């Protein structure tokens, strides 16, 4: 199912193109980090599950485009997904095929990966609980 069809079918706010929705991938350190972030989000959102929190392939409805366009604190990161889930935003996932990187190098070397995970965990477990919510946001 494609992302547009899923958004129309479910009336959700965000559709994530997931690498792991229906397909298993070989376990590596990146996947372990992604799963740890998935569990952190589940803990802080009352069990809401997003299987591929680090996927950058996302489709936003008009309301979400407006929110991301006007709020500088919205970034395409897992902690923002946790915040949005706690605000009542509906997020769905569909399986997509993504190819491995064929050129360039990731900025997430070992040191940067540790730093990234620390920032995400701090934000998900601490900062999101004190973050000011906009009018209409839940919780």
Predicted regions: what is each one?
Residues 1-74, 101-111, 115-118, 122, ...:
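Acceptor/aglycone-binding surface of glycosyltransferases and processive sugar-polymer synthases
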Residues 123-127:
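Negatively charged linear elements and acidic catalytic determinants
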Residues 79:
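Cell-envelope/extracellular polymer assembly enzymes that use nucleotide-activated donors
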Residues 48-49, 71-72, 82-99:
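Catalytic donor-sugar/metal-binding loop of nucleotide-sugar-dependent glycosyltransferases
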């Amino acid at each position: 199912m494609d992302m547009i069809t899923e958004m129309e079918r479910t009336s959700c706010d965000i559709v994530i193109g997931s690498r792991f929705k229906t397909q298993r991938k070989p376990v590596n350190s990146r996947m372990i980090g992604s799963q740890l972030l998935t569990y952190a989000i589940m803990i802080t959102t009352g069990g809401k599950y997003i299987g591929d929190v680090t996927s950058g392939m996302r489709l936003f409805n008009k309301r979400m485009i407006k929110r991301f366009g006007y709020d500088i604190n919205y970034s395409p990161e897992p902690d923002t997904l946790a915040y949005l889930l706690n605000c009542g935003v509906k997020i769905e996932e569909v399986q997509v095929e993504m190819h491995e990187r064929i050129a360039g190098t990731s900025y997430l070397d070992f040191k940067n990966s540790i730093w990234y995970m620390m920032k995400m965990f701090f934000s998900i477990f601490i900062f999101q609980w004190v973050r000011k919510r906009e009018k209409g946001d839940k919780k």
